[in-house]
């Protein structure tokens, strides 16, 4: 019997050569069906779940574990500090130990293969029952995921060891089991040498976090099946190659049938072992090779995910069924043709996203419902591909991708981002076995999934001989799929696809170590013929995804630019309640983890609860499959007619479940609508005609809104879900007619009263009082009602976005980041003085001119001149002239701000882009219209508070008693910019009694090519030193 002391002395968890002991060889997932019918219907599997409540006890280190606890019988009453824990789960999320988040750095001293002596060790125990029938068969226990390494005992006997937290660990318990109650004990070690290969940008969490199953199969059994579909040169007829490994006598046979539902497509194909000569010495005695031809099957693609069922049976010498396995299969062929990645002979455009397995309460333990929700949301938002960043996912995820239709890049659980150099272990022969094990076992497990079209060697671990070995094995074992790997420059010999991360569209990035060309340039390099698919791009951290549409213009223009995978899908925030009972999303450092990278795990298109960020709408729009062109407009008094070309970017499917819903918009409001069926062949253009009867009014603005919605429920969305959208501004449209607002009249003479301290302008409907010293409005009344609660002032500052801060690693901030440059220039801290104020009255109006100087550290940074022109209705025409110091960096914003008293029913109404938040470089998806939302609806609760809620291209704003017209951007919030800047979490935000209103002439873009360098494109930077803008402000008078 192997003692615990012997195991500890052996220290498998600090030996890179030992990645497993006594583990069953990797294979495709098995279920052990008894009949063909059960296998076909996927029922009555002989796999039993051991999930549930297990005993748990946490120790400081492996050496502290009491050996007797692993052997003793389990009593019904927990004792000796044992507690109950859910399996699967991460123990840190059940109050044991603490979560740690780091982006690049390891959370321990780097000295491979050694790990800290203080090494939290969780011991698990549970019991299960074995029947007499099961005892006559083979019984394997399968741990689908344990982080990071573990030893296993059964009935007091040591069984084996395993590491690689993201792949199955399977052990044969057959010789150790008894009829009746059996007990297992698991000692899970938080840090192992395997942790050096798992330095992904995610939470470090531990425990048995995926399913545990007991698989019972007969002594003679199927132990592996490898199914490879192929299509003929016309992509019409198919051939299925099936390789079955068995443990059975030589006179046993293997039968294969293909089912479409309950209908068999062929007679059973029966074959004995050793039926194929593989080299000069002969064939395999335990492997059966079979080929089945299928005429004109339906093809699998992400657009048309049609699946068949392949049932493989083991027959004894009498022809009786002994063991059955079954797999969903899709007939599809992946190729590189003419420098493009193709499926079934057609080039793809990858609308991809990187996805971590993350749940805000359960950490890395994700349920079937969680996976289905993610896949459906991806499909609903026009994603067709997912990269399993950066490890093999739960095995069910691939079945769901097969069924619902997503292309998958399956990635090995290898990342050494914190190593110096990054590729240190990739070039070390001592670690070759660990690298190879992680890759080969992934491929062995997942090889039968139609959805997997690309294998990935891992992420951010440099490039070395170990990668070349993995690549070579892959091309030999599974030549049906390409291999990608970004490390070492994205275009090494270990990748079939140029797969850079965060390369720009047109600009090279300087990097002395590896090339970082623009994606357009990369294609034109001498001798380069591979396609380019960005493995990561458009870093969606917080308020981000600016200029995303630029990528999609390039993808559609250059055939070998075949898309990419956005980083990333969901914010990795963990749910937490503060001492006041307020909920917030936690990130690095919030659990006492002193070594952390703060909020860099918060970079998804969705919040942790899967609520969308505004950036998701931009991604959905840019990636949509239908492209619209307004080709012709014919307008007359009785009927208007519009010809619209609709190009379908679908590659394989007709739009046979779509309808076009159109709306005619007048001054932001729908005045006419209709719908029509939309049936377009893939990769073709259909011209449709829309006729409207609304007569155009002079001075009004007209837009045509187009939405393509589902007619019936689909396998991923309900009827009426909108997949594609567009808006066209129609001819004869003008900006909102200024005559809609009250103009000057000859009634009510304006009086101007001036003292040393104040300047007052008023009549019987309004009153405006300026402070002579500050030059600011102290009081503005309209019909005895207060319009604003604080002065109108210049505003140049925004609460820094993550992209402004340039955060990647807390101890490695970019000194050239926008926030750092703004801070050095004192933006947001300037001292304002009024150098002059004067008023001139005419017969029809009063003009007040105020000049303001802004200083920082005794240096003049800016000067502004405000010219107010007041007529006798109280309407203010405001002109602002801004002159900036030539030494200033590009500004965050140019505009003004004020506050307004909050009312219980405050609604913000505007005519401009909406309804969701949009910024100058992220507004393609937004539509021009008239919107009315509450303050809460305007607010985007970014986990790390920043500037938010902007609406662009506005012409009208109405909040309580304030009305603004002109051309501007605005934001209205219960939180000040200072509060947003100071807060680190949303629970720290305290709503003010007032509304903070920001009216911007110009606002800098959000950027988003990455989040650690100044990535806002030049056309969205405020680099000018002189600005002039005009607005009209009224105190609630409209007609």
Swiss-Prot record:
PANTHER family: BETA-GALACTOSIDASE
Binding-site positions, Na(+): 201, 600, 603
Notes on temperature effects: Optimum temperature is 4 degrees Celsius. It does not grow at temperatures higher than 25 degrees Celsius.
Domain of life: Bacteria
Cofactor-binding details, from the entry: Binds 2 magnesium ions per monomer. Binds 1 sodium ion per monomer.
Organism classification: Bacteria, Pseudomonadati, Pseudomonadota, Gammaproteobacteria, Alteromonadales
Protein name, UniProt field: Beta-galactosidase
Intrachain S-S bonds: none
Effect of pH on activity: Optimum pH is 8.5.
Family statement drawn from the similarity comment of this UniProt entry: Belongs to the glycosyl hydrolase 2 family.
Pfam families assigned: Bgal_small_N, Glyco_hydro_2, Glyco_hydro_2_C, Glyco_hydro_2_N, LacZ_4
Annotated site residue numbers, Transition state stabilizer: 356, 390
Residues that hold Mg(2+) 1 according to the record: 415, 417, 460
Gene3D superfamilies xrefs: 2.70.98.10, Galactose-binding domain-like, Glycosidases, Immunoglobulins
Biotechnological and industrial applications of this entry: This cold-adapted beta-galactosidase could be used to hydrolyze lactose in milk and dairy products processed in refrigerated plants. It is in fact superior to the current commercial enzyme from K.marxiamus with respect to lactose removal, especially at low temperatures.
